[in-house]
């Protein structure tokens, strides 16, 4: 074993070889007083035969190798996990890697944009999860020849994500930003395949591109009809369209596109169309049309006309174009009223004979030549007014107003202006609308309510989109009110979709 002095000399020699121009002297190296540098000593090999150092170096080497192997194994596991998550995400979002090309031809006769440009059309697979009050959901896939992956993993995701859903739940693709098509900055029609919660508060998002929604039932609109196949709980949506109107639509709409745009006017007010589109995106900050209602239109077209996904994509472009047209008309200050609703006389079968309406009619001259400004219809005591008000989400909410005690000489009027908007006013004895006064009516969500036990509504008028007069349930009060009216002038009044018709 070398001594300490020999080891120091060897190190000094090695240092001098590294920097021959500037010799470095170690602290423990003794330098002679002579001017000439000392002769270099011969390099000595360090041959350490100590087994303890070898074992120590070997253990360090083994530790480093094991650490590297562990890191490599973790990286491989992470890569496998990423691939698995990517496959699951593709399965959930029904992502297609080879989108087809379809021509967008022949817009709607009601004003949709016509173009012959080619557009990208991603036809997603739609997976419907049906849960009819059972413990385990039944997965039913709609026919899609472009994808054959099984949706079993999705069922577990749905079961864990939505523990409290009721009736039917639909899972469909909601496109991301890259799937939106930029026409005037706000097309993005792929989003109409998404489904949101219509009137419910239980919709949840599994991921960025998947939305869960509970389908509605017949109890939501007992007087309405089904969109789609009423015998297939996976392909139907309940709507507020009455049977007579649905028959009228089916009779007059001979093409799928015309029926889709007609249903759009029945289900969404033009004001809602003007501030909305299918995707809820765009430079104007528009809201999304209720996806459940759009899904109902889709089911109805598939059921009635047997359209394909490519046809549905083209129809969605026409729906977006119709919304843009309504937005432009609103920006220009033009009327948004649906003229066909005013020209069409609804069938008397829409309401039963027992639904006798009590009202004071306007003069006959007013019926023959309606004034351009407004039409007025007075309501009597104990009259019940049924209000269908459209919310911001495009859904029709049904409420009732029970006309209470109207002071002598005063009355409650329904006013329809030239734009088709309806209002309810409290009019005084001088014929002027009482500003800031209490409307002589109370609101109720129970159609069977007969008493006037609620608090009066504040304000001089109520803005509504649809109004129809419901049957009088309090016959005693109705008889008293009838004595004050002219018995020969009590025609049946039908107010439907913003247009008041007198028969």
UniProtKB/Swiss-Prot annotation:
Residues 160-350 are annotated as: Interaction with CUX1 and HDAC1. Keywords: Acetylation, Cell cycle, Chromatin regulator, Coiled coil, Cytoplasm, Developmental protein, DNA-binding, Isopeptide bond, Nucleus, Phosphoprotein, Repressor, RNA-binding, Transcription, Transcription regulation, Ubl conjugation. Residues 174-203, 335-371 are annotated as: Disordered. Residues 65-98 form a coiled coil. There is a cross-link at residue 141 (Glycyl lysine isopeptide (Lys-Gly) (interchain with G-Cter in SUMO2)). Residues 360-371 have a biased composition (Pro residues). MAPK1/MAPK3-mediated phosphorylation at Thr-345 and Thr-360 results in export to the cytoplasm. The keyword Coiled coil applies. Residues 343-359 have a biased composition (Low complexity). One of its GO terms (biological process) is chromatin organization. GO terms for cellular component: cytoplasm; nuclear speck. The modification Phosphothreonine is found at residues 345, 360. The keyword DNA-binding applies. Pfam families: BEN. InterPro entries: BANP, BEN_domain. Part of a corepressor complex containing BANP, HDAC1, SIN3A, SIN3B, RBL1 and RBL2. Forms a trimeric complex in the nucleus consisting of BANP, HDAC6 and KHDRBS1/SAM68; HDAC6 keeps KHDRBS1 in a deacetylated state which inhibits the inclusion of CD44 alternate exons. The complex is disrupted by MAPK1/MAPK3-mediated phosphorylation of BANP which results in BANP export to the cytoplasm. This facilitates acetylation of KHDRBS1 and CD44 variant exon inclusion. Interacts with TP53. Interacts with CUX1/CDP. Interacts with HDAC1. PANTHER family: BTG3-ASSOCIATED NUCLEAR PROTEIN BANP, PROTEIN BANP. Belongs to the BANP/SMAR1 family. This is Protein BANP. It comes from Bos taurus.
